[in-house]
Amino acid sequence: MQKTDGIRIPGVILDELKTLDYSQDERFSISEGKKRRRGNGKHLSRKEKRKMERADKKRKIISTREINSSRLKSAPTSEKRSANAGVKNVGKQANGKNPISSDESESNENWDSDEVLTDEVAEESGEQAMSAEETMKKLESLKRKAKGIQGAENSGEIKGNSYEKKHIRNRDTNENFVSYPLAPSDRSAFERDEMDMQYYAKKLGLKGERKAIHAKDEFDAIGGLLEGLEYFENYGKSDEEYGDFATETNSMRKDDEASEKAFSSDDDLSASDFEDSDGLSESDNDSVADSDDNYRREKENPYVAPTQSVESYVPPSLRKKLDDSENNSTLSEISKKVNSSLNKLSDSNITIIITDLNRLYDSLPRQYVTESLTKGILNIISQNQKLLDGFIMNYAALAYTLSKLRGIEVGAFFIQKTVEAFLHHYEEEMENILKDQQSKISSKICINIATLLSYCYNFGFVSCRLIYDIIRIFVADPNEFTTELLLRIISISGQLIRGDDPSALRDIRSELLKNAKNLKEQSPRLRFLMDTMSDLKNNRLKPSILATDHHPLKKNLQSILNSSSSWEPLQVSLEDIKNIDSKGKWWLVGASWRGNMENAFEVSINNENDASKSKKSKISIEDDLLDDIPDWNIIARQQRMNTDIRRAIFISIMSAQDYLDAFSKLEKLSLKNKQVLEIPRIVLHCLLADSGSNGYNHYYALVANKICERYSHLSKSFQFLFWDVIKKFEDKEFDSESDTDEEDDLDDKEKLLRISNQGRFFGSLLANDILKLDVFKHVPFMGGLNTEGMLFMEILLFQLFLTVAKKSEKKLKMDESGNKRIIYSDDYLRDVLTKNVKSENMLFILKGLKWFINKKFRYHNFLAGKKGDKAFDRDERRLAWASKAAKSIIDKELENIDS
């Protein structure tokens, strides 16, 4: 490959440079272009004129520099780069002219490099270009010159003082700048930058050699470079809060500073610049020292005032005493407020006192107020003289009202402490009686507390369970003291005791009689107690022994109690109150399980090791609670309830507690009109399904009555059901094969029960005016019914007359012989037999009933019990009157029809 000694320039470019003249090119004509812009005729402001003058001066400097400079030399920053740059850039100069190209002018590689070496620039545009031989000679001279400078620097021949080095540095920097022809857009951008730099330099006061700015005073933020800001003074103070992240950022910052120092030789800085940097470094060191001092300073909480601890040390043994003393002082203050209100209590201001005490619960500890209230009431009631009933009743009403307003905890705590106080005084009094201290006057404290508990029971504070437990204590050991207590409770709460649990009252009376017989002598007070118990059993208490009524006071408190929630009496027993330490607080849910653990687990105590150890025992607990509850869905499917609506109705009726519960469940189903029509058939089906084992159940008749009251059109459905039953009992065969097949599977006993239940059910509907007597128009009384049909009609009339007679019965006062007189009114029976019966059916129905009552109706066969029984005699009396009255009413109606 042939080696070339120089750079080959294309001939096309050389020909273009030789032939073309760029002196008249508008792109390089600066002054003329400016003159044309000035000649546009636009009016310039003073500020714009000054800008134009500064631009003209700058252009003159540039133009003189282009003309006077014969060549531009580049002095590289490093010696090695300067030696290589002279060889590389020789070929870019050809015939003393620079090629002008838009691509080359915009290239960073050709025009922005620091290593560009240019040849001589023609001073005049008309000068002739150099030949190829002259160009090669020029390049060789430049190479020799560059090698000579490099060798001199390496051998140490270039020496001089600081002034000479500075002069050389300035000369080299001037030679670095290469002036090329600029486009108008670049020239205008350059002018704008120069104008901006001169403007800001003037504002900052930078003139001549003064190239650094300093703060004039402490308020000069720009000159001081924001030295006065606290953020920059305390910067880095909280680096420790960020842990390793802060150390990483500090190390990165140091690396950046080190890298900047390493490349500082590339920048041409003057001596003044180094002096300024020294000053800045000193100030930086001072600021770092100040920041270190601030960093060691302790942090204070700005939200807490500085205080000095003057409290003395309190040993742990005395701290609890201090807390107790503080609690006692608080409790004493609350007690004063509560007692002040309790001492003012009366009938007239009871609502005001209750309101004041209720407000104390909002501002003071609830438990302290409850304790003070209970203690205050017991101190007032526990007096050794008998207090008035109205006085004690006010305090019972106060405790009841506050318990209802403030919750069950207030009432439970009050009842607990009251019963404990009563038992304490009762045991003391019984001990005195056992010691034969009869001469001593008995205390009235127990009587007053028993009166308080009785009124609490009257207000609905506690249930009858607690009162019965207390009465059983008195009955177990009858004497003068217990007799007086028992009479006191009966006089206040006798009527409620009898109404809540009559069987328990009967048991208590029998136990009292049994214990009284064992006594050698019965005191007059004990005999009076037994007579009073007998009167209470018979509901004949004398008004003279009754205590003050509580109903007016309870009515007066309704204005306060309307805003409170519903209240159920406390279902607490005397056993729960006695065993509160072992079983826990009885008013809390689940607290009583703690005392009943011995019933589920066997616990053995190891006395040899003096430690209790529980033996692990396998206990099989069978939860048979759910086994007793039938699965009504399965039963409904077994009873052929083949739709969801029928199953829902069946379950609602069969799973209800009573007929009202069944009615509410049916209402919740929200049945449509067509769906409601399913209810009568399902009610009758349930009646027949239940009759096989339980006999007749009046519950289904009550459900039918309640449903017909709500949906009156259902009476028509029951009427059609009645006619379907009658058709079964006619002599001719019935069309429905399914029902006959079902009845064929039943034995004679089940058939009789089925007929009996149907007859009594429809008899009840007739007696309650659900069905009218007009339904008998399709009943063939004379010769059209079989034996089962005759039996069905007998039972129907039996139930009809029995129910009507019961409603028509009126009891009068006793006569002179002591017997009660009972009379009957035939108005209701007349309405049943004649009302709502169409005239065309009246004759047929009445004649058929008259014949059936005279020939077939034998009510004695259906009476339950034996002659002489109270129920038997009552039913016989009612049926005898009803049958006789029905005959007379029918005869009168037939006479009226015939006439």
UniProtKB/Swiss-Prot annotation:
The keyword Cytoplasm does not apply. GO terms for cellular component: FAL1-SGD1 complex; nucleolus; nucleus; small-subunit processome. Residues 335-540 form the MIF4G domain. Residues 644-781 form the MI domain. Residues 24-33, 134-143, 162-174, 251-264 have a biased composition (Basic and acidic residues). Disulfide bonds: none annotated. The keyword Nucleus applies. One of its GO terms (biological process) is ribosomal small subunit biogenesis. Its main location: nucleus. Keywords: Nucleus, Phosphoprotein. Residues 24-181, 248-326 are annotated as: Disordered. InterPro entries: ARM-type_fold, CWC22_splicing_factor, Initiation_fac_eIF4g_MI, MIF4G-like_typ-3. Involved in osmoregulatory glycerol response, probably through its interaction with PLC1 which regulates the expression of GDP1. Belongs to the CWC22 family. This is Suppressor of glycerol defect protein 1.
